[in-house]
A protein has these predicted regions:
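Metal- or metallocofactor-binding catalytic centers and their adjacent structured scaffolds
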Residues: 58, 64-148
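Extended, Lys/Arg-enriched charged tracts that mediate electrostatic binding to polyanionic substrates
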Residues: 23-38, 144-148, 152-157, 161-165
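Short alpha-helical segments and helix-capping/turn motifs at coil-helix boundaries
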Residues: 39-42, 51-53, 138-139, 152-158, ...
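Short beta-strand elements
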Residues: 53-61, 65-71, 180-195
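Short, Gly/Pro- and small/polar-rich lid/capping loops
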Residues: 1-56
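Glycine-rich, aromatic-flanked loop segments that form ligand/cofactor-binding clefts
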Residues: 58, 141-144, 157-186
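Metal-dependent enolase-superfamily TIM-barrel catalytic cores that perform enediolate-based chemistry
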Residues: 171-255
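Solvent-exposed loop and beta-edge segments used for protein-protein assembly and interaction
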Residues: 47-51, 135, 163-165, 231-233
Length: 255
């Protein structure tokens, strides 16, 4: 079976693009927004809607394989790829990547993924944006699965010499800034790993001595013990602090 055509469509992600540099420089929360001036190239606001690109492989039998190109919340920070805007990258996919697949046989996932993963963009001389590779390889996996009438997990297991898990894979839930109310929802639904909690600002969230994050972790522990649906529920706590503790304690690991 062959890939007849590659089609792209712009979309929105489930979360946001946040300018981490501006937030660390003091941009303040205002509801779901941040007030401040963007400091990272590409941003027009400190927080703006996350963007995605849906990549669709139209197959010979009429089936459609899907993949979603999406980037991380803090795009452009810490050496990451630049802000992923659909209007900038749909032309790249259509002009440079679609020809790698259109009219080609569907082979294996690894072989098809390598076409984009290991390719060098003729327009930049670099490998493609991580979001592009993430989404296009998803479409490759879905195409192989559909051509073989298998689940995507089965294709991965077969190609990498492993087995599909017989147990549920733990999923990490993220609260965003509403770290108290959303933690309650996670506890109610027995989330495996929680809550992320988005401690990305020293003064307002972490505390100048780390006291706010300490208070939150204590509250979270007690909340689980008080409200968990059963005693067998013992979730993993994952708190993301975005390097703020290094700022608070001046990178003193003994503090």
């Amino acid at each position: 079976m062959k890939v007849k055509k590659v089609v792209c469509a712009p979309g929105k992600t489930g979360f946001f693009f946040d300018d981490q540099k501006a937030i660390k420089a003091g941009a303040k929360n205002d509801g779901a927004f941040y007030i401040g001036t963007p400091l990272t190239p590409g941003f027009t606001q400190v927080r703006q809607a996350g963007e995605s690109i849906s990549v669709m492989f139209i197959l010979e039998n009429g089936a459609i394989a899907y993949g979603d190109c999406a980037a991380v919340q803090y795009s452009g920070a810490g050496g990451r790829d630049p802000l992923f805007l659909a209007k900038d990258f749909i032309p790249v996919i259509e002009k440079e990547i679609a020809p790698l697949y259109e009219g080609k046989e569907i082979t294996s996932f690894r072989e098809m993924a390598d076409l984009v993963d290991k390719a060098i963009s003729p327009s930049t001389g670099k490998i493609y944006h991580t979001a592009i590779r993430y989404g296009v390889t998803q479409a490759c996996l879905d195409a192989v699965a559909k051509s073989q009438s298998k689940l995507m997990a089965q294709v991965v297991a077969n190609e990498y010499g492993t087995e599909v898990s017989k147990k549920i894979i733990p999923i990490f839930s993220q609260s965003g800034d509403d770290r108290y109310l959303n933690a309650d929802k996670m506890i109610m639904k027995c989330a495996d790993v929680l809550p992320h909690a988005l401690f990305n600002h020293v003064e307002t969230k972490v505390g100048l001595k780390g006291e706010k994050i300490k208070e939150y972790v204590g509250w979270l522990r007690n909340r689980v013990l008080e409200l968990r649906p059963c005693e067998c529920y013992n979730p993993i706590f994952h708190i993301d602090v975005y390097g703020t503790l290094g700022i608070v304690f001046n990178n003193d690991f003994e503090a």
